[in-house]
């Protein structure tokens, strides 16, 4: 494989010295970009974009052609695993993801297969290898998956949910059944991420989007325990260099110390944490990624720069910080404002790395 021309993202995750703070954005390939909307129209729909390696590669690279980002992230969806388990993923306009089959009994869980990444999710592996080849060493490629808890909520609720009542009821009424589901998902995520690493992903992130909706005790039992299991089973070195792992629990700021003990290299932070406080709590153990409120991108350019400067100052001097948003960039953001954000990170962070 081609040598990396820009490895500051990987270096920051491993707390090695960098010249400026690296930056990328969750959902950087997305609807805020006119070129993405054109590709999606050409593909027909969202799943056709995901399942065609050429389209997935095209949209992954679009933000890199527009901005000086320090990483690319595979264009895919967290729900590819439940889809490969036979649940029948589809997207309802205005409602988001739905499943044709819903998990409601222990028998449903017993019947679920653990997908083979090559056979059942080969289109994702092909997308990873295609993107990696096309990147040609420009920046590292991030692979990703949803966390077992987050995937389980969609599988049990049948789609998005405001209160996760069915999944939480299962946690209290029939914890053995939920643990069986989470265990199958942990096995699936481990092999899926390892497949992505072997196909060319140079770092991986686990998105625990709904872990922050649990009580402290339930978070430990039903979310963090399974992420810990995944981390312990991941390939951590490939192609002669370390493969960093990032854990991101949205609304997980109360539990940073526990998450930092899970064995990952970095923690993703949402915007409700103060990054300087997070560094004081866990920064000797792990790198930190985040954490500007994505809605700041609706503000004027000078306000965006001011908030970037504030977050950089909060983190302070030295490496171990990857700048990102605290969640995904939203569709109505002006692409020019995203550019202001990315350029501000590079320009204003140099003083912290002298």
Swiss-Prot record:
The entry's keywords: Cytoplasm, Decarboxylase, Lyase, Porphyrin biosynthesis
Site (Transition state stabilizer): 77
SUPFAM superfamilies in UniProt: UROD/MetE-like (SSF51726)
Positions that bind substrate: 27-31, 77, 154, 209, 327
Keyword Transmembrane: no
Cellular compartments annotated: Cytoplasm
BP terms from Gene Ontology: protoporphyrinogen IX biosynthetic process from glutamate
Xref: InterPro entries: UROD/MetE-like_sf (IPR038071), Uroporphyrinogen_deCO2ase_HemE (IPR006361), Uroporphyrinogen_deCOase (IPR000257)
Broad class of enzyme this protein falls into: lyase
Cellular component terms per the entry's GO annotation: cytosol
Catalysed reactions, as listed in the record: uroporphyrinogen III + 4 H(+) = coproporphyrinogen III + 4 CO2
Main subcellular localisation: cytoplasm
Its biological purpose: Catalyzes the decarboxylation of four acetate groups of uroporphyrinogen-III to yield coproporphyrinogen-III.
Binding partners and assembly: Homodimer.
Protein name as annotated: Uroporphyrinogen decarboxylase
Organism: Pseudomonas putida (strain ATCC 700007 / DSM 6899 / JCM 31910 / BCRC 17059 / LMG 24140 / F1)
Gene from which the chain derives: hemE
């Amino acid at each position: 494989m081609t040598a990396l021309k820009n490895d500051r993202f990987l270096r920051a995750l491993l707390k090695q010295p960098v010249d400026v703070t690296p930056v990328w954005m969750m959902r950087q390939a997305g609807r805020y970009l006119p070129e993405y909307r054109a590709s999606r129209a050409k593909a027909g729909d969202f799943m056709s974009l995901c399942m065609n390696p050429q389209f997935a590669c095209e949209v992954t690279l679009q933000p890199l052609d527009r901005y000086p980002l320090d990483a690319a992230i595979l264009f895919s969806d967290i729900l590819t695993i439940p889809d490969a388990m036979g649940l029948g993923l589809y997207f309802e306009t205005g409602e988001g993801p739905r499943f044709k089959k819903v998990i409601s009994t222990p028998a449903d869980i017993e019947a679920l297969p653990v997908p083979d990444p090559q056979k059942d999710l080969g289109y994702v592996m092909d997308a990873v290898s295609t993107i990696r080849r096309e990147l040609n060493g420009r920046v590292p490629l991030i692979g990703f998956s949803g966390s077992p808890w987050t995937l389980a909520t969609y599988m049990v609720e049948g789609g998005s949910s405001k209160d996760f009542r069915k999944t939480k009821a299962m946690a209290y009424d029939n914890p053995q059944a939920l643990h069986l589901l989470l265990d199958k998902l942990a096995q699936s995520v481990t092999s899926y991420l390892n497949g992505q690493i072997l196909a060319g992903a140079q770092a991986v992130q686990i998105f625990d989007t709904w872990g922050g909706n649990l009580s402290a005790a339930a978070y430990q039992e039903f979310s963090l325990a399974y992420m810990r299991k995944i981390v312990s089973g991941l390939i951590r070195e490939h192609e002669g260099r370390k493969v960093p792992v990032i854990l991101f629990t949205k609304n997980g700021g109360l539990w940073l110390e526990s998450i930092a003990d899970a064995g990952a290299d970095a923690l993703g932070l949402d915007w409700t944490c103060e990054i300087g406080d997070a560094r004081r709590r866990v920064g000797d153990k792990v790198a930190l990624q985040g954490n500007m409120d994505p809605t700041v991108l609706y503000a004027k350019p000078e306000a965006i720069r001011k908030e970037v400067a504030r977050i950089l100052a909060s983190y302070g001097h030295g490496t171990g910080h990857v700048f990102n948003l605290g969640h995904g960039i939203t569709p109505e953001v002006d692409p020019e404002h995203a550019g202001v954000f990315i350029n501000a990170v590079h320009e204003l962070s140099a003083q912290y790395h002298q």
